[in-house]
Amino acid sequence: MAPAWSLLLALLLLSCNAICSLGCHLPHSHSLAKRRVLTLLRQLRRVSPSSCLQDRNDFAFPQEALGGSQLQKAQAISVLHEVTQHTFQLFSTEGSAAVWDESLLDRLRTALDQQLTDLQACLRQEEGLPGAPLLKEDSSLAVRKYFHRLTLYLQEKRHSPCAWEVVRAQVMRAFSSSTNLQERFRRKD
């Protein structure tokens, strides 16, 4: 358990440093909100992942949307916004309230909302720059389709605790990938 916690902490620290280099000035509260989101997602785990092995599924995570070499900074911010928005919507459903503690979900939604606010301000700033490309439609569509597959899976599994555990792990993967995207841009700067 300690190595997993150490890895999570390392990803969080990378994220905090990396987000500041995306070309806009996100407040320190954004870094704290990202840290809170990952911590809260970890705390949501109520079912042992090993007991849900039969529920695993390949949701075809759109890694190319987060890792394409042609992705510009403004596009990266748009992808991060898209992932955060869909995560907020996913954990705002009635099905999520039936599985997890409402207080914990409220804290998660508050942290996600803070991230959305920061990213929206950043998007407005980036859109004002001359020649700033907007999100490629295929990246946006790939993220939307991914979250749609997660939603359909939850419906198919009738929002079972194991289904939510699988989805929770997928969302953590998406946030980890967004951290990697942020780190890639930090290294370029």
Curated annotation (Swiss-Prot):
| Gene Ontology molecular functions | cytokine activity; type I interferon receptor binding
Write the record's keywords in alphabetical order, separated by commas.
Antiviral defense, Cytokine, Disulfide bond, Secreted, Signal
The keyword Signal is assigned to this record = yes
Entry keyword annotation includes Manganese: no
Q: Name one GO biological process term.
A: T cell activation involved in immune response
Q: Per its UniProt record, what InterPro entries does this chain match?
A: 4_helix_cytokine-like_core (IPR009079), Interferon_alpha/beta/delta (IPR000471)
Q: How far does the signal peptide extend, from start to end residue? A: 1-23
- Record's GO cellular component terms: extracellular space
Gene3D superfamilies from the xrefs?
1.20.1250.10
Pfam families, alphabetized? Interferon
Concerning PROSITE patterns, the annotation shows: INTERFERON_A_B_D (PS00252)
Show the disulfide pairing.
24-122, 52-162
The listed locations are: Secreted
- Superkingdom assignment: Eukaryota
- SMART domains named in the record: IFabd
Q: Which family does it belong to?
A: Belongs to the alpha/beta interferon family.
**Quaternary structure per UniProt?**
Interacts with CR2.
The protein's role, per its UniProt record: Produced by macrophages, IFN-alpha have antiviral activities. Interferon stimulates the production of two enzymes: a protein kinase and an oligoadenylate synthetase.
Protein name (Swiss-Prot/TrEMBL):
Interferon alpha-1
**Organism, scientific name:** Bos taurus
Q: What is the lineage of its organism?
A: Eukaryota, Metazoa, Chordata, Craniata, Vertebrata
